[in-house]
Amino acid sequence: MLKEIRGKSAKNLRGRSFLKLLDFTTDEIRYLLDLSKNFKDMKRAGIPHRYLEGKNIVLLFEKTSTRTRCSFEVAGYDLGMGVTYLDPNSSQMGHKESIEDTARVLGRMYDGIEYRGFSQELVETLAEYSGVPVWNGLTDLFHPTQMLADLLTIEEKFGYLKGLKFTYMGDARNNVANSLMIACVKMGMHFTACSPKHLFPTEDLVAEAKKIAAQTGGSVTLTENVSEGTKGAHVLYTDIWVSMGEPDSVWEERIKLLKPYQVNKAAMDNADKDAIFLHCLPSFHDLKTTKGQEINKKFGLPEMEVTNEVFESHKSVVFDEAENRMHTIKAVMYATMC
């Protein structure tokens, strides 16, 4: 079964850290997606796959999460591993102990480390000093595990990735947009960032993405025009307008800037007839959260980055996407540890 689950696209990723997709080739990403599909099939068929029995991992969370934590924990248990969760109050990392020292201690006790927090530099340091695979659960710059789930979901719906038109609407300089741009061009897709100009991705990252696109047949387009940006798109994707850790004072400015970039019926109608909608979640698409109620009371906006009509429509595959976090994270841990 081990040989079978690796598949024909198998690559040797043992000992590698998963910090950003820029570190991985198209073929390596393809292997992780194929492996994810195999694990998903096994999970649904009820076939045990405790291939990492006896190993232990630690999850370091400086930012809270539902999907990332649950995905790593369930994936870890399914693979037979022991899982330790540490929140900001449970470790001395960066406060009374340096990142380098913490990394070396954890590397002696655990076989793998997940980090979700603010600093990309911090997760890179953990990888450098721990001596074990480190997985980026999210930083302010990149969100690579989310990208694998997104790619898997898109491929499940269309049957392929290369050549598809992908449009991200909203704050295109955030970690999700950065990662999506790289993920799309790595797989030969056509990525469009549809946002206000001063929220475009950085010039350096765009240049890097275009360099990759030239090799894979993909492309990168930046536009402020919603009609142009969504026309014929196979995938429309958005994220909340204020990132984790940003103060509430940012909301007013961001809402004013991004309201024209809301994913609504008009945007979906302008996209390809078979277009799908993705969102990494959580989403402010109704008034069923305290934060959503606060925003509506202050700004008179019952729906934010996506309308409830689109979110609840048959074109929305956000819960398939959320489930796929677990399968893809399982693939990453297996590939880098076994």
From Swiss-Prot:
<protein>
    <recommendedName>
        <fullName>Ornithine carbamoyltransferase, catabolic</fullName>
        <ecNumber>2.1.3.3</ecNumber>
    </recommendedName>
</protein>
<dbReference type="GO" id="GO:0019240">
    <property type="term" value="P:citrulline biosynthetic process"/>
</dbReference>
<feature type="binding site">
    <location>
        <begin position="280"/>
        <end position="281"/>
    </location>
    <ligand>
        <name>carbamoyl phosphate</name>
    </ligand>
</feature>
<keyword id="KW-0056">Arginine metabolism</keyword>
<dbReference type="InterPro" id="IPR036901">
    <property type="entry name" value="Asp/Orn_carbamoylTrfase_sf"/>
</dbReference>
<comment type="similarity">
    <text>Belongs to the aspartate/ornithine carbamoyltransferase superfamily. OTCase family.</text>
</comment>
<comment type="pathway">
    <text>Amino-acid degradation; L-arginine degradation via ADI pathway; carbamoyl phosphate from L-arginine: step 2/2.</text>
</comment>
<keyword id="KW-0963">Cytoplasm</keyword>
<dbReference type="GO" id="GO:0004585">
    <property type="term" value="F:ornithine carbamoyltransferase activity"/>
</dbReference>
<dbReference type="GO" id="GO:0019547">
    <property type="term" value="P:arginine catabolic process to ornithine"/>
</dbReference>
<feature type="binding site">
    <location>
        <position position="175"/>
    </location>
    <ligand>
        <name>L-ornithine</name>
    </ligand>
</feature>
<dbReference type="InterPro" id="IPR006130">
    <property type="entry name" value="Asp/Orn_carbamoylTrfase"/>
</dbReference>
<dbReference type="InterPro" id="IPR024904">
    <property type="entry name" value="OTCase_ArgI"/>
</dbReference>
<feature type="binding site">
    <location>
        <begin position="65"/>
        <end position="68"/>
    </location>
    <ligand>
        <name>carbamoyl phosphate</name>
    </ligand>
</feature>
<feature type="binding site">
    <location>
        <position position="92"/>
    </location>
    <ligand>
        <name>carbamoyl phosphate</name>
    </ligand>
</feature>
<feature type="binding site">
    <location>
        <begin position="243"/>
        <end position="244"/>
    </location>
    <ligand>
        <name>L-ornithine</name>
    </ligand>
</feature>
<dbReference type="GO" id="GO:0005737">
    <property type="term" value="C:cytoplasm"/>
</dbReference>
<dbReference type="GO" id="GO:0016597">
    <property type="term" value="F:amino acid binding"/>
</dbReference>
<keyword id="KW-0808">Transferase</keyword>
<feature type="binding site">
    <location>
        <position position="116"/>
    </location>
    <ligand>
        <name>carbamoyl phosphate</name>
    </ligand>
</feature>
<dbReference type="InterPro" id="IPR002292">
    <property type="entry name" value="Orn/put_carbamltrans"/>
</dbReference>
<feature type="binding site">
    <location>
        <position position="325"/>
    </location>
    <ligand>
        <name>carbamoyl phosphate</name>
    </ligand>
</feature>
<dbReference type="InterPro" id="IPR006131">
    <property type="entry name" value="Asp_carbamoyltransf_Asp/Orn-bd"/>
</dbReference>
<feature type="binding site">
    <location>
        <position position="239"/>
    </location>
    <ligand>
        <name>L-ornithine</name>
    </ligand>
</feature>
<dbReference type="GO" id="GO:0042450">
    <property type="term" value="P:arginine biosynthetic process via ornithine"/>
</dbReference>
<dbReference type="InterPro" id="IPR006132">
    <property type="entry name" value="Asp/Orn_carbamoyltranf_P-bd"/>
</dbReference>
<comment type="function">
    <text>Reversibly catalyzes the transfer of the carbamoyl group from carbamoyl phosphate (CP) to the N(epsilon) atom of ornithine (ORN) to produce L-citrulline.</text>
</comment>
<feature type="binding site">
    <location>
        <begin position="143"/>
        <end position="146"/>
    </location>
    <ligand>
        <name>carbamoyl phosphate</name>
    </ligand>
</feature>
<dbReference type="Pfam" id="PF02729">
    <property type="entry name" value="OTCace_N"/>
</dbReference>
<dbReference type="Pfam" id="PF00185">
    <property type="entry name" value="OTCace"/>
</dbReference>
